Amino acid sequence: MEQDELRDQLVDPKSPINIESLLDTITALVNDCKIPVLMRMKSVDNFISRYERVVESLAALRMKAADFRQLKVIGRGAFGEVHLVRHTRTNTVYAMKMLNKDDMIKRADSAFFWEERDIMAHANSEWIVRLQYAFQDPRHLYMVMEYMPGGDLVNLMTSYEVSEKWTRFYTAEIVEALAALHSMGYIHRDVKPDNMLISISGHIKLADFGTCVKMNANGVVRCSTAVGTPDYISPEVLRNQGQDAEFGKEVDWWSVGVFIYEMLVGETPFYAEALVSTYTNIMNHKTSLKFPDEPLISTQAKDIIKKFLSAAPDRLGRNSVDDIRNHKFFVNDEWTFATLREASPPVIPSLKSDDDTTHFEEIETRDRDNAGDFQLPKTFNGNQLPFIGFTYSNEYSPVKNLLKGHGAGSKQNGIEQHKPQTVVEQPLTNGHASGVPEEKYEAVKMELDSKNREFELLKDSIARNEIRAKMIENEKNSLSTKISDLERELKDNKDKLRHGADSDAKVNELAVELRMSKEYNSEMESELSKFRDKCEQLKEDLRKKSGELAQEKNETQRVFQQKKDADEAFAEIKRDYELLQTRENEKSVQLKKALDERKENGAYQQSVAKATDAEWERKMQFYEKQLEHANDERKREEQKRTAAEFDQSRVARKLAGIEANYELLQNDYKSMKEARKDLERDLQDVITEKRRLEIRVEQLMDSRNTDERVLSLCQDELVESQEEAKYKEDGLRGKIDGFKHELENEKMKTQTLEENLLVADKERGMLKMEVQELMQRHKWEITNKDQTLKHLETQLDEIKQQSKIESSEQESNDKQTIADLRKKLDLEKAHKKAVINKLEEEMAKRQPLKKGEKGVTKSALIKKEREIMALEQERDTMSKRIAALFYENDKQAEHFNIAIQDMQTTQDALRDELKECKEELANRNVNTRYEDKRSLDSREGIPSSLSNQHIQMEGWLSLRDNTKKSRKPKWTNCFVALNEYSFTIYVDEKAVSVILLIEAGAMAHVRHVTAADLRNVDDSQLPKIFHIMYDDASCNSSRHASNSDLSMIESFREESWKRHDFQELSYHIRTFCDVCNKKLSDIIRPTPAFECKNCHFKTHKDHVAQGSLPMCRYNTGLSRELVLMAPQTDNCNKWVSQLRRFIESSRSAAVSVSRVSSRRHAPGSSNSSTIYQ
């Protein structure tokens, strides 16, 4: 009973003492103890000496990275990479995740890989990615998973415009995947489209379980860190950051709500460029969740999003997943949750091969860094111990082999059957004792081993051939189906094109080609049947030979056992015989001595000697009988030995027969391979022929559709076309005359209307070309319609005559025709439905984009259509108003001339005044009174510090576009100029069209950005980007501060924060403190830090407690932000330096500027910044 329990634990993959774990244990101990310091101890040195070669042998026999050929890198994370690999033995493609052990040990939650391994290995669900193998070496962990060639849902959203129908389908599948994960007792915590992979069939599976955590008996988890992607993280997780709190599986359902919103709208609902702003929106989700006008979202979709993105106690799915399944959003006529797996997915990925990676982003391949190996420790540290038991195999595992061996035999012989069944290993060790030459037995052993290996290879080859035969059969079935479809279409084409001689010829050719294809297909079927028969015959021969080989093995074992027993018995008899001879010699000597003593002692001794002699004679007789019996036994054993040698020779003869049969099997296998190659070539020819026939049928269908359209439309449009063409011609002539008159009048207009007139001229040219095209098209249509009308009249006469003849026959064929038409109608409906589904996919599919170019969304297309309609209306309105504009232009020209003269006069006066001011500035006495110290520039509202420092810089920068949220930012090139008066952004270097002007004194802050400020930006771009904050008095001047405080730390007063609105964050990307310039970030254990939600000021938590902070530069309600990128890092540093000088100079003159401004301008008459639309 205890042995059975122990055996069950050894073969149970979930047991901590299974065979794989024990092998990991001995390997880890040897690797951890093999250091010079420990090997000085004799016990450790003996342990290493005993097991070092054993571990090396285990490493060679167990699964390793060398068993897979790496094809491409398809994913990269902070702790490892995901490679596309191919198994060298089975030629199967997998995705292999490789993790660095050193990074795993340094990480705080280093046990995360156990959850990922256990979920994928033991999850019996079709919605979760399956683990095939897990193994390790001294440096890395490897997880080999099934390959999902369709990529992730992020790739699908960038390639297609996702509709609500598609969103419903994919949401239902992710609900089923999460339900399966929750039933195992785990919470995912990082549900997002990046972790939803598309299989070869188009269905999705959940992946990336590194963030999963096990729930307790109450279905909750206690955690103090915020884990997950910022855009998808739930508010209760953010609220309890840094505090030990409980939450359940409802955090995953929040992420599902964000996922639905992103699928429908194209962006996440709470997205913001700065991480702290994203967290603020999530915490204020009740007010920040808004739905755009475009695209249109149904009421059911909005309802399920709101229920998912609600407070944790009220969130949909908190009580049961059935509440989600019963929501009205999932009601449809195509599938239910019970039939979801069998339903047809919206998109099935198109693949060129089994290792196609077109649905994955291109990732640069990096060389492996050997610097991350474990450093040689000074004492035992057990680096390999945390990974004991990680190894797992779904197929090639000793556990599987033990289970198979145990199932084949009885419990008593189970241990013997579990041993490797190589050819008679133990009897061969006794070659000399049995009298058989050892060299002969070694040769026989090697022969049988080689035959075993060849036998296994032959079995594998036959299995692969069977798979290939099934593939050929499936291809044959698909060809048969397509040929039958072509026959149906050919029949329809014959019925519809029977009146045309050319069509009949084409149909006849197609029929001949189809008949030849069918004949060829039948030949292929006969070849395939012969191929199957050969495979079955070879399999039967293999079964027979394997049975004979097993019998021969048993017979050989029996013979060698008999030899061993005979040798042992012969040796024992020989020892007994020698012992008896020794005793007989001793007795003879004693007898001789006794006779001598009897002669010497007299009569008394003679009587005693007689009795002794009689006793010795009896003993001698007894020993002689035993000796004769031993001789008989020795003869019998020699006979047995002779029989055993005869049996051995018989086994050798049978082995020779097996070798001959094996050569025959090899020849059959070679012929079978050649036949398979011939079949593959024939199959390729059939596929080529099928494609040619499909092209032919498509051409015939196109010509048939064209004829049908002409016949159906000509009769209706023939009468109307002439009148419509005449009416359009008269109207277009009138328009041409009108545009000619307008063109003559436009030449007399002033310079201010030249741009509008140029647009009108272009429109006139376009309309003229359209008129000409319309005239030519209508003339051609009239000619074509006339010819068609004559042809139709001729056909009509022929049809009338023919109809009289066929009227009698038509009545009898009506019923049959109606039945045929109904069948055709059903077929056409099915065909149309398939075409509609395909068209939906093609219409949703986006065009391939160039690098850096954004796709056109449905909302953008709708906006473009509206803009086109608005432009058309504007064109009509403009044509109506142009006459009035011409009349008003003369009056306006006079006013413009007068205004220009006034402006020139004013400009000359200002120039003179500026010249006088500069002269007066040069003659100023520095030691005069304070009022006289002010420069003329200051009196004019320009800070003297700015004018004296000669701040001037210009160049090209890239302005970040914040109009639309997206995963990849969009940058717009612009020309920027900085002088002592303002900071101006122009459209181009001509400096005519102004985008933004920031005057002196309005600039509040400038700084370099970090990775925490801008997400989705390449690391190479970060040193080139800087952030500007400025005041805009034209905006709303409300100054109420934000009430949301995500950190929930109320012990700090607002006065000590210096108007900052802080959020507690943990930085895992490179970030520095703005107070002490020390690092805030760490990949493993980041230090506690704060970031201001307004000015993005970053600092250590200790600085906030000490109160050593500068004042927040953000003016609530008035401040605006800009993000600019320079071409080079040095250029960015120069811009930041000049802008800081600009800000410092404007602040030093703020008092004087405010006084001058109060004298020269009325309150509210000027703005600090002006934005030009």
Swiss-Prot record:
PROSITE patterns: AGC_KINASE_CTER (PS51285), PROTEIN_KINASE_ATP (PS00107), PROTEIN_KINASE_DOM (PS50011), PROTEIN_KINASE_ST (PS00108), RHO_BD (PS51859), ZF_DAG_PE_2 (PS50081). Keywords: ATP-binding, Coiled coil, Cytoplasm, Cytoskeleton, Developmental protein, Differentiation, Kinase, Magnesium, Metal-binding, Nucleotide-binding, Oogenesis, Phosphoprotein, Serine/threonine-protein kinase, Transferase, Zinc, Zinc-finger. Residues 68-330 form the Protein kinase domain. Residues 331-402 form the AGC-kinase C-terminal domain. The active site is at 190 (proton acceptor). Residues 786-848 form the RhoBD domain. It is found in: Cytoplasm; Cytoplasm, Cytoskeleton; Cleavage furrow. Activated by rho-1 binding. Residues 950-1144 form the PH domain. It catalyses: L-seryl-[protein] + ATP = O-phospho-L-seryl-[protein] + ADP + H(+); L-threonyl-[protein] + ATP = O-phospho-L-threonyl-[protein] + ADP + H(+). GO terms for biological process: actomyosin structure organization; cortical actin cytoskeleton organization; embryo development ending in birth or egg hatching; embryonic body morphogenesis; embryonic morphogenesis; mitotic cytokinesis; nematode larval development; nematode pharyngeal gland morphogenesis. A zinc finger (Phorbol-ester/DAG-type) spans 1059-1112. Transmembrane segments: none annotated. GO terms for cellular component: adherens junction; cleavage furrow; contractile muscle fiber; cytoplasm; cytoskeleton; nucleus. Residues 1154-1173 are annotated as: Disordered. GO terms for molecular function: ATP binding; protein serine kinase activity; protein serine/threonine kinase activity; Rho-dependent protein serine/threonine kinase activity; small GTPase binding; zinc ion binding. Its cofactor is Mg(2+). Residues 1164-1173 have a biased composition (Polar residues). This is Rho-associated protein kinase let-502. It comes from Caenorhabditis elegans. The gene is let-502.
